């Protein structure tokens, strides 16, 4: 006896008996997708469940990734210095006089010590950092910082001991 069954909620074709050599087939088609009915009887299509848990939540890291690189980028681009200059200019009544006084002070620094200013340390940055420090904000001298992400001279000693 051979029978083929396909299910459809609404259409059933006639059955042919195979006992006498006739083939018995029942054809039904059933749609098995994510169509559901809500309380009002409307069909709701859901591709996936809406209450999905975060798989990576249990692998929470101790630090925010790439923060060190972002801090380095901000310092290299000079956003901190730009904000400091804007803050100093907003506090001054006469901006042109302020710029001229900063330039004159930077020229004095260069005249006093030409060897110190020329490489990575700039006299104008020294003047601006001094003015911002006078306002109460902590800035390194001439905005020069050693790279905190490069290992120091004792790096190999610490690594192997």
From Swiss-Prot:
UniProt note on tissues of expression: Mostly expressed in leaves, flowers and seedlings, and, to a lower extent, in roots and stems.
A single BP term in Gene Ontology: plastid transcription
Subcellular location: Plastid, Chloroplast
Coiled coil (residue ranges): none
Recorded GO CC terms: chloroplast; chloroplast nucleoid; plastid-encoded plastid RNA polymerase complex
Induction line: By light. Induced by cytokinin (e.g. trans-zeatin).
Keywords for this protein: Chloroplast, Plastid, Transcription, Transcription regulation, Transit peptide
Observed effect of gene inactivation: Albino plants with defective chloroplasts containing a few appressed membranes but lacking thylakoids, even when grown under normal light conditions. Reduced plastid-encoded RNA polymerase (PEP) activity.
Transit peptide: 1-32
InterPro entries to which the protein is assigned, alphabetical: PTAC7
Main subcellular localisation: plastid
PANTHER family linked to this entry: PROTEIN PLASTID TRANSCRIPTIONALLY ACTIVE 7
Primary role: Essential for chloroplast development, especially for thylakoid formation. Involved in plastid gene expression, probably by maintaining plastid-encoded RNA polymerase (PEP) activity.
Subunit organization: Component of the transcriptionally active chromosome (TAC) complexes. Interacts with FLN1, PTAC10, PTAC12/HMR/PAP5 and PTAC14. Binds to SL1/MTERF3.
Protein name listed in UniProt: Protein PLASTID TRANSCRIPTIONALLY ACTIVE 7
Organism, as annotated: Arabidopsis thaliana
Encoding gene, per UniProt annotation: PTAC7
